[in-house]
Each structure stands twice: as structure tokens, then as C-alpha cells.
Curated annotation (Swiss-Prot):
It is found in: Nucleus; Chromosome. This is Late histone H2B.L1. Belongs to the histone H2B family. InterPro entries: Histone-fold, Histone_H2A/H2B/H3, Histone_H2B, HISTONE_H2B_site. Gene3D superfamilies: Histone, subunit A (1.10.20.10). Disulfide bonds: none annotated.
């Protein structure tokens, strides 16, 4: 039996398309959340003419996640010790003083206080 001739517009398709999963809709890829845009904004505030590679951005993102997890874990422990069920800015401030060394802790506390004040006045 001779093979059917292909229409002129469809010569040698590259890949056969697999049928879509049940439901007939295309699966959407889950978004990866990161601090990339915020790291980039801070970089441009500090050094407007400097760029950052994707590898360096990945390292910075890991660093921010690590510091966030350390602060959250220690603040949770502190609240538990004091029989509190809520982590407030006071716990976070105490933890920052514990985790960060000297001058860095002072700057972090002042920036945090400034951010909380700005937030409460904007409400």
C-alpha cells in the first residue's frame, strides 16, 4: 500500500506532538520566587554603574534566604521561651542584635526601626 503524500505546506514536521494531559489545557510552569529584583534595586542605589551576574545573583539570593531563615528560627525560639505565640518587631530586633556583629547590628536595627515607622505612618 503506497504512503499518503503530505500536503505542500507540511514537509517533514520536526517532532510529533504528544497529546495534552486530561483537561486539554497547557500546564503552566510554577514560578520561582526570589529576592532578585530587590537585590538589583539596592545594588543600583549603592552602585548605579555596576551590574551583577546571574551566578552572583543566585549567591546573594541564597544569602538573603539563609539570613531570613536564621532570624525567623531564632525569633520563633525566643517567642517560645517567653510563652508568646506572636513574633513581633521586638523579637526580630533582639534576634538581629544576637545574630549580627557589632556595627552591622546597629545599622540593621536603625534601618528596621525606620522601615516599621514608615509602614505604620502610611496606614
Amino acid at each position: 500500500m503506497p504512503a499518503k503524500a503530505q500536503p505542500a505546506g507540511k514537509k517533514g514536521s520536526k517532532k510529533a506532538k504528544a497529546p495534552r494531559p486530561s483537561g486539554g489545557k497547557k500546564r503552566r510552569r510554577r514560578r520561582k520566587e526570589s529576592y532578585g529584583i530587590y537585590i538589583y534595586k539596592v545594588l543600583k542605589q549603592v552602585h548605579p554603574d555596576t551590574g551583577i551576574s546571574s551566578r552572583a545573583m543566585s549567591i546573594m539570593n541564597s544569602f538573603v534566604n539563609d539570613v531570613f531563615e536564621r532570624i525567623a528560627a531564632e525569633a520563633s525560639r525566643l517567642a517560645h521561651y517567653n510563652k508568646k505565640s506572636t513574633i513581633t518587631s521586638r523579637e526580630v530586633q533582639t534576634v538581629v542584635r544576637l545574630l549580627l556583629p557589632g556595627e552591622l547590628a546597629k545599622h540593621a536595627v536603625s534601618e528596621g526601626t525606620k522601615a516599621v515607622t514608615k509602614y505604620t505612618t502610611s496606614k
